[in-house]
């Protein structure tokens, strides 16, 4: 290491980090040139805990993989078992799942934008975003009965139906939310401070997206719209879903992808409710769970989430593997550092990834000469 090179730690406790991890930034003078990310502070072993449990208990654990996008985990868990057991859920349940999934996407993107704006010292816009988010949280609570761990999905459908009065309330609050959102996006697009701290900062080129296998708004901000798994979902195809993408690949592009995805999510919710009104019947079926292996993927707010499972005829989980989007997105971070002039920009580039640490934690054990050797997870 030359005389000008130095390493500084960020975390595991830091004002800009939503969850604990340590970023070891390598600096050449003031400019970041490399990073090493150390994890392991919040590993809980959920995959191992699920083994041997019935899938009706496993779905509650799946909801606790992530505290921000808990809903998409239960939806993917349920749809994986429905795929293995060839269970066809009612149309009502399909559209209600879309409504709730998109509400969760909106609230997650609003948190991501708020945290990013805090990292570039735009506290006013951050507080505005969190205030507007309460409209969405109220809708989620009205539909599911809860605000965080919603307990809404079951194998074979959903737990609660909605009525005409609730639908009118959703339409009314979405109108209010859209008006606020337009003002927020205008401030973000035209603000000189935001442009100074966001444009041409943390650039992730298209070829590095392909190399690191980044997913979600990260790769869509670098020109890869086909990464959105909603394009492959039959219900979203019925709703004529259109992916949002940009080519610049910088912090600004990633945040604008999230803002524009919120607009598309609002449209999808309205469209899903219109289709729901035309449906009749129940919201769930009695599920006969059959043994087998299978996997299912959905588009979480941060990107592709995968559940791979093996279950018995009685519904006991033999093995489960969960891959969350931040696993891939963290690897892309060090390539963003090349266009970060200062340490402060390295921090904002990190928040533009919108990482979720708790759902990324994994424990790897290597067996050598009959001895188990735990391996810590590091992204170099």
Swiss-Prot record:
The lineage of its organism: Archaea, Methanobacteriati, Methanobacteriota, Methanomada group, Methanococci. Pfam families: Complex1_49kDa, NiFeSe_Hases. This is Uncharacterized protein MJ0515. InterPro entries: ComplexI_49kDa-like, NADH_Q_OxRdtase_suD, NADH_UbQ_OxRdtase_49kDa_CS, Ni-dep_hyd_lsu, Ni-dep_hyd_lsu_Ni_BS, NiFe-Hase_large. It comes from the Archaea. Keywords: Oxidoreductase. Belongs to the complex I 49 kDa subunit family. GO terms for molecular function: ferredoxin hydrogenase activity; NAD binding; nickel cation binding; oxidoreductase activity, acting on NAD(P)H; quinone binding. PROSITE patterns: COMPLEX1_49K, NI_HGENASE_L_1.
